[in-house]
């Protein structure tokens, strides 16, 4: 285009020189250079003095318009001037043109006219990068849509304490709406200002899903969501996105609408949620857990803060989703009088409490199956196999005995919440059933802290925690039992959680029995078989593959395995053997007891003072005995029966080092002495010359009032 203008200028200069020659025919001829300069000056005089400036429209930089009247130095690209010539000059210039010049001028004029006729077209986004700008891709359908405020450029300077937005702020505000393809919706119903989480209302599919629930006229299939017409979606596009006019937004909305029509409410799966951990359904063999509704506030109060933090809210939300339930609002599900609410949370116990409420049962829709005698016998057989690796107290069996005497045929629910499984848990010690002729022991709930105070440590160590956990599980009770017959309001709900007891409680609540006469004939046989099972259980309970310490046959071999003593306190005699044997028979000991340990403890108990378990001299004696064990192999053999109980199981077990074994022996001696001093003051007929029983503020063990113990034992009255 510029070449065409240069050709026109050359022609105009030539025409001007020809005109000047005609006007000065009477004057003498001069040098060619002088004639050229004179002609150029004359042409310059004929030109107007207006200076042309580029148009302000940057996209039409080939157009020019007149500017100011002043002559100012211009850039080389702006030296071109648009002038008007007389008709005589134009005709003269046309006469001097050659064929090539005419063709060039025609081509240039055609190009110029074509450029002028073309309208400015909208730039279509391409997948390639444009000049200095990154192309914005359409948003993915599975990513939440983000709304941008219309006055974003005005809000940014307010946050930066400025009155007007700067160029950087305007560019940033312009880039954000282009990235998200739309500005904030104007309609108030699209975004609820009172909603605590506005992201839900900003999602296109979620908005449409919320509207679907408001439809009152459903199709024949009530489980499928009602289809949305494209006309409604078209109106939704116009109302929700007034600024979304490009093709990318239209395509995104169409794809979203197609996906929305294919949604079905009855086929949505919880495990296919993007970005969330898949949770398994709760196991029916495990006890259901109820979660409090105000869990975030409860966590905040425990942390002494006014409001729950984001971490507390996330943790509370995860726990609720994990257990699939919140705390039941109905008070009838939980008994306020029961101190242990676990029995009411058991599925079978809840079913037993609902049996009395089922008065009107539709036989055609739902009917609980009657339990035949054969099924009851099979249940007893399974209990016989699985119950006696665990601890089943004699008080519980006596309660079962009392309940079974009033057995009548009954219904059982087809929904069995707890399945009888074997107790062969990996790397977990099996506890022997308690003997009714031995003392029942209660364990303090703060046993780790008591051990830490007695062993002079700031906090319980791992060995102390392991020992306390095992002892608590070994005796399986932390509080007194109010009576030998455990009822529904007992402190310990273990009996109600037993399968046989649950079945026995349900038998008394049965009201709808069809074959009453037939079952009554077989009732006596069922009860007789039940008593036979109890006798077999009593005989086999103490012969199971469970470690139980007995009186040694070879005292010398037992003494050789025990700890090494440096003084005569560990020397055994007939009195020590008698006390040691009685101590083994009086309790279900949690740890192995050696004769020399009994001899040392007997010396401590017979002191006139400083015999309390909390006394510093007692602690020093046991610590010195543990420090004297210098051989690792001997110490490991000494603690072999109790090694896993003290050091832990599996991957959580502590390494077998001399330091850990010494601490384990020290912890074991402190625990066993607390039990031994109780035994000595209970058996005053066997242990002579005892001082008054100490009354320390903290005890690890306590004898239950339900204990029978040795029938010939004598109980010493408590001392002040």
UniProtKB/Swiss-Prot annotation:
A motif (RxLR-dEER) lies at residues 56-71. Residues 320-335 have a biased composition (Basic and acidic residues). Keywords: Glycoprotein, Host nucleus, Secreted, Signal, Virulence. Disulfide bonds: none annotated. Residues 1-20 form the signal peptide. It comes from the Eukaryota. GO terms for cellular component: extracellular region; host cell nucleus. Glycans are attached at residue 609. Its main location: secreted. The keyword Cell division does not apply. It is found in: Secreted; Host nucleus. Residues 264-335 are annotated as: Disordered. Belongs to the RxLR effector family. The RxLR-dEER motif acts to carry the protein into the host cell cytoplasm through binding to cell surface phosphatidylinositol-3-phosphate. Secreted effector that acts as an elicitor that induces cell death in host plant cells. This is Secreted RxLR effector protein 138. It comes from Plasmopara viticola (Downy mildew of grapevine).
């Amino acid at each position: 285009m510029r070449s065409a203008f240069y050709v026109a200028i050359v022609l105009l200069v030539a025409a001007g020189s020809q005109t000047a020659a005609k006007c000065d025919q009477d004057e003498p001829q001069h040098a060619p250079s002088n004639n050229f300069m004179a002609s150029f000056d004359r042409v310059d005089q004929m030109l107007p003095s207006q200076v042309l400036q580029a148009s302000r429209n940057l996209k039409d930089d080939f157009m020019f318009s007149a500017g100011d009247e002043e002559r100012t130095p211009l850039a080389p690209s702006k030296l071109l001037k648009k002038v008007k010539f007389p008709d005589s000059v134009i005709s003269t210039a046309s006469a001097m043109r050659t064929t090539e010049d005419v063709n060039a001028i025609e081509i240039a004029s055609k190009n110029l006219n074509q450029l002028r006729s073309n309208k400015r077209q909208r730039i279509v986004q391409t997948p390639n990068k444009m000049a200095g700008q990154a192309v914005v891709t359409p948003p993915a359908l599975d990513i939440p849509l983000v709304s941008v405020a219309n006055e974003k450029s005005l809000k940014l300077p307010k946050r930066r304490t400025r009155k007007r937005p700067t160029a950087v702020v305007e560019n940033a505000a312009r880039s954000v709406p282009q990235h998200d393809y739309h500005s904030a919706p104007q309609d108030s119903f699209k975004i609820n200002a009172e909603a605590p989480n506005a992201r839900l209302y900003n999602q296109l599919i979620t908005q449409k899903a919320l509207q679907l629930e408001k439809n009152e006229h459903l199709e024949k299939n009530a489980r499928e969501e009602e289809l949305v017409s494209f006309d409604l979606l078209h109106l939704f596009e116009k109302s929700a996105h007034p600024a979304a006019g490009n093709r990318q937004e239209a395509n995104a909305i169409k794809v979203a609408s197609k996906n929305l029509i294919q949604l079905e409410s009855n086929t949505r799966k919880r495990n296919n949620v993007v970005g969330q951990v898949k949770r398994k359904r709760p196991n029916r063999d495990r006890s259901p857990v109820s979660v409090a509704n105000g869990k975030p506030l409860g966590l905040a109060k425990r942390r002494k803060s006014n409001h729950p933090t984001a971490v507390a809210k996330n943790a509370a939300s995860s726990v609720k989703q994990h257990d699939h339930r919140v705390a039941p609002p109905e008070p009838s599900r939980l008994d306020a009088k029961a101190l242990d609410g676990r029995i009411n949370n058991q599925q079978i116990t809840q079913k037993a409490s609902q049996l009395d409420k089922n008065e009107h049962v539709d036989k055609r829709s739902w009917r609980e199956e009657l339990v035949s005698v054969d099924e009851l016998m099979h249940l007893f057989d399974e209990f016989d196999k699985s119950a006696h690796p665990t601890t089943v107290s004699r008080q519980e069996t006596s309660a079962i005995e009392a309940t079974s005497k009033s057995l009548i045929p009954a219904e059982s629910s087809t929904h069995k919440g707890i399945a009888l499984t074997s107790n062969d848990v990996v790397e977990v010690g099996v506890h022997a059933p308690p003997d009714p002729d031995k003392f029942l022991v209660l364990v303090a709930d703060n046993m780790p802290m008591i051990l830490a105070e007695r062993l002079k440590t700031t906090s319980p160590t791992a060995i102390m925690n392991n020992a306390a956990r095992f002892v608590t599980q070994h005796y399986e009770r932390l509080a007194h039992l109010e009576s030998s017959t455990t009822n529904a309001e007992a402190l310990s709900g273990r009996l109600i959680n037993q399968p046989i007891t649950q079945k026995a409680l349900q038998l008394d609540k049965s009201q709808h029995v069809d074959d009453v006469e037939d079952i009554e004939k077989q009732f006596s046989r069922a009860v007789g078989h039940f008593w036979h099972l109890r006798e077999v259980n009593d005989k086999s309970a103490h012969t199971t593959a469970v470690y139980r310490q007995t009186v040694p046959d070879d005292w010398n071999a037992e003494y050789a395995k025990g700890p090494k003593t440096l003084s005569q306190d560990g020397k055994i005699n007939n009195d020590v053997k008698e006390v040691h044997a009685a101590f083994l028979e009086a309790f279900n000991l949690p740890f192995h007891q050696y004769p020399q340990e009994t001899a040392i403890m007997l010396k401590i108990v017979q002191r006139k003072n400083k015999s309390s378990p909390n006394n510093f001299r007692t602690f020093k004696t046991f610590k010195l005995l543990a420090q004297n064990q210098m051989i690792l192999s001997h110490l490991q053999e000494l603690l072999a029966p109790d090694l896993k109980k003290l050091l832990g199981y599996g991957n959580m077990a502590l390494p077998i080092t001399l330091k850990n074994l010494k601490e384990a022996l020290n912890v074991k001696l402190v625990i066993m002495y607390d039990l031994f001093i109780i035994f000595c003051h209970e058996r005053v007929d066997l242990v002579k010359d005892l001082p008054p029983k100490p009354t320390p503020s903290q005890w690890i063990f306590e004898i239950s009032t339900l204990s029978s113990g040795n029938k010939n034992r004598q109980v010493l009255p408590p001392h002040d």
